[in-house]
Amino acid sequence: MVALLIRKESFEKEISNKKIISKKYLSREKALLEVYKHLPKKIPKISTTGMLSRELNEINTKNKTTDSTLMCVGGMGHAISIATGIAKFKRKKKILCLDGDGAALMHLGAQASSAKMKNLIHIVFNNFAHDSVNGRRPPTENISFYKLASELGYSKSFIVKNKKEIKNKIKFSLKSKKSVFIEIICTRGHRKNLTRPEKDTIYYKKKFMSFLKK
């Protein structure tokens, strides 16, 4: 195994491409907040590494729901596998995976297993970029994640692009007795003053494990 260590700010900012979504769509943070607004507070949430987890952590901290989330810091692509494992052993609970386009692509095959979990909701925020590395583009320009999800076995798969659609599909997902996949199209970028979690990952893991036992 080889590891390449790179200093912070080593990457130049990526130049926008044709597929970069126009400003008429929600930012990922606003889309995430819209999702959160329609969730029960006690639903377990597993979030992918990077900016999405940092945005979710701010929302959780504000609403005192930090215990309900496992942030997969440094575990890109593994959120859905962890969510699948939890869904398997907590079949009476709805389990939510909050994923990114690059992360979902990294371990795409895992969705063949996650699709079988009837209590799982899998949401992919697709902004056609890796925001945590200056917006580098993953090779997803011609990929429709919701179509792939359907082929991989999800009972229902949707693509949404605005608040109303997000609200409708979240409500549908919470009532569904089968697996649901939602692709949310959103814009690139994040707030420059976005904070990081205050505690270490072990702390949040233990809090989440205690939450699951309730």
Model-based region annotation:
Residues 29-34, 38, 58-213:
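Thiamine diphosphate
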Residues 3-5, 46, 181-183:
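A structural signal for short, well-ordered beta-strand segments and their strand-loop junctions
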Residues 13, 54-56, 81:
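Phosphate- and divalent-cation-binding pockets in alpha/beta enzyme and binding domains
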Residues 10-15, 21, 43, 202-214:
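SAM-dependent methyltransferases
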Residues 8, 15-48:
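Active-site pocket-lining segments that scaffold enzyme catalytic pockets across diverse folds
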